[in-house]
Structures are given as structure tokens and as C-alpha cells.
């Protein structure tokens, strides 16, 4: 099952199983990899406007699955509000005995934000979704 959503004008609209989406603000996709694994693919900008939608989505996925992988490869901007959401999701996963992994390519925007803030060590980080899935075993 695949879920796709797109944030427009402060509202998240579910678009079902449609083809690839592009948005100037935020693109969120959730793919099930078995009953207890979700991959959340994030594209666009994670800022004060879009971070609450990501927060809601990650909270829901952590309630539904024991492993959530957040693929940040297509993120063009990761602000402090986005970092806060990722940190809160990591804390939630720890409290609920769940696992959260971030996919952060070395040359990506998300990696720059994690390095600039020194927060990279606070997260489980892998360079690819496959590596995150393998490392989580």
C-alpha cells in the first residue's frame, strides 16, 4: 500500500495511489514494507509551515509500525522546525520501543542541516533506504 500526500495552502490532501507528485512546498509519501515497516519519503521544504504536517504523519506511522525509515534525500530545505519534528519523532520512537531511521545522503541538504547543528549524532542515520532497513535488524 502506498500513501501520497501533498501540502498546499496549509492543508494536506491525500492523493491516493497516483503517479509521482511534485510540489514547491512539501511532498510526503508512505510505503509499507510489510506489516511493521514504513518508509516515509519526504521531498521539498521542511519549515515552520510544513513541519506540523510531517509531525502528524510521523506520529501516525510510529503508532502503526515498529520501524519507520524517513527518506530525506529529496529535501531541499530543512529548518529548525523540521529538525525539531525529527527529534521529537526519535524521542517518541524510543519511548514506545520503536525504531526511527533517517536516510541522509552525505551531499544532501538534510546532511548539511544535521552537520551545522551538530544533531547528526542524535539520530540513527543511513545513506540509503536499503542500508537503513539492513541496519535496523
Predicted regions and their residues:
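STAS-like cytosolic regulatory interaction modules
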Residues: 1-74, 88-137
Amino acid at each position: 500500500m502506498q500513501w501520497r500526500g501533498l501540502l498546499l495552502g496549509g492543508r494536506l490532501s491525500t492523493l491516493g495511489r497516483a503517479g509521482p507528485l511534485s510540489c514547491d512546498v512539501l511532498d510526503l509519501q508512505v510505503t509499507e514494507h510489510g506489516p511493521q515497516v514504513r518508509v516515509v519519503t519526504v521531498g521539498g521544504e521542511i519549515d515552520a509551515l510544513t513541519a506540523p504536517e510531517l509531525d502528524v504523519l510521523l506520529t501516525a506511522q510510529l503508532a502503526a509500525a515498529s520501524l519507520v525509515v524517513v527518506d530525506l534525500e529529496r529535501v531541499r530545505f530543512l529548518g529548525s522546525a523540521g529538525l525539531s519534528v525529527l527529534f521529537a519523532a526519535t524521542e517518541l520512537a524510543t519511548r514506545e520501543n520503536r525504531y526511527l531511521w533517517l536516510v541522509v545522503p552525505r551531499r544532501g541538504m538534510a546532511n548539511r542541516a544535521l552537520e551545522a547543528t551538530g544533531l547528526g549524532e542524535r539520530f540513527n542515520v543511513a545513506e540509503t533506504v536499503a542500508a537503513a532497513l539492513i541496519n535496523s535488524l
